Swiss-Prot record:
GO-annotated biological processes: cellular response to oxidative stress; hydrogen peroxide catabolic process; response to reactive oxygen species
Chain positions of site Transition state stabilizer: R134
UniProt name for this protein: Cytochrome c peroxidase, mitochondrial
Subcellular location: Mitochondrion matrix; Mitochondrion intermembrane space
Similarity comment: family membership: Belongs to the peroxidase family. Cytochrome c peroxidase subfamily.
Gene that encodes it: CCP1
Transit peptide (first-last residue): 1-32
Subunit-level organization: Forms a one-to-one complex with cytochrome c. Interacts with MID1 (via C-terminus); the interaction may contribute to cellular detoxification of radicals.
Record Gene3D superfamilies: 1.10.520.10, Peroxidase, domain 2
UniProt-annotated catalytic positions: H138, W277
Species the sequence originates in: Cryptococcus neoformans var. grubii serotype A (strain H99 / ATCC 208821 / CBS 10515 / FGSC 9487) (Filobasidiella neoformans var. grubii)
Amino acid sequence: MSFRAPNLIRSTVGRRAGQTLNLRSQVIRRRFATEGGPEITKPSAPRSSNTGYIFAGLGVAAVGAAYYFYGTGRTEHDSTNKADTVVREAVATVEAKTGLRRGKDEYQKVYNRIAETLDKEGYDDGSLAPVLLRLAWHASGTYSKADGTGGSNFATMRFKPEAEHSANNGLHVAREHMEKIKQEFPWISYGDLWTLGGVCAIQESGGPTIPWRPGRIDGYAAQVTPDGRLPDATQAQDHLRFIFNRMGFNDQEIVALSGAHAMGRCHPNRSGFDGPWTFSPVTFSNQYFALLRDEPWQWKKWTGPAQFEDKKTKTLMMLPTDMALVKDKSFKKYVDIYADNEEKFFSDFAKAFSKLIELGVPERQWAGEPWTMATSD
């Protein structure tokens, strides 16, 4: 991070940087009651051989934090949050550059623990995998490439405004479940935890291997994005392009990511819609595309929002946004490819989903190339 420090900062940077670091330590120890965030566990002491790197990184962060705190006219509360975000970003960057971040084996333990908890008797079709996949998707799909806001970096669905966005109805189930995992591994950020949960859900349900890496940090309620950034299921192809192009996805990636509907079902008390997309809603496959293309569909006669049902069994459903994929010529060609070739779908989905869950995370926060997490079997 670079900026032109005002004269006040130049003359007092040492003293106020120290004050800011002290402020940081106080912030870490308290619970963010006004933000609704969790208590942050004090990190373990760094290895002595890298202490100089850490202090150097935190010194840069302290100067940046001091600038925001003293030089922008913000309220103390806003400045404290902004300063703490700057420090967290700096710490993540230092960890990435000095090799201090926990290794793959530590994150594999988190993955394994999530995998152990996926089966849940009495919940939907007996698995939490679909709702964990949805959590990872929705936590990442708020990104805007125009201003760099949104995405998985700050895990802002922890806060009431975003949690209550209509598109996130029902995701409290996933967040509450993942909170139990967080208690076992308090060092992992929520953004890393939720996206790793999505990767686990896909892989453990027979889907492709998804490249994943840690580096996301937790943010504040002020970083919540506006409502309306996630797809509206009642809309058509123009809406899909508007939503996905904002994140930087093309037509092929839009169709590939829509394949996540291979898993799960809709609920009248959440989205208003009802039913699964496929006959195997806890298995990740290309069945969604085959059914979408090959089955005859009709409007469902009911009192709920407009949706489609299959003519044969009337047990499956498709949303207006799903049907848009076969009505649009550009989208349809990818539906055909994926319906006929599951291997191609898996390959394209893995690339698109890995891209999705990294949206909004500064490149400097990554420690290296993505990992391949081993499945439980």
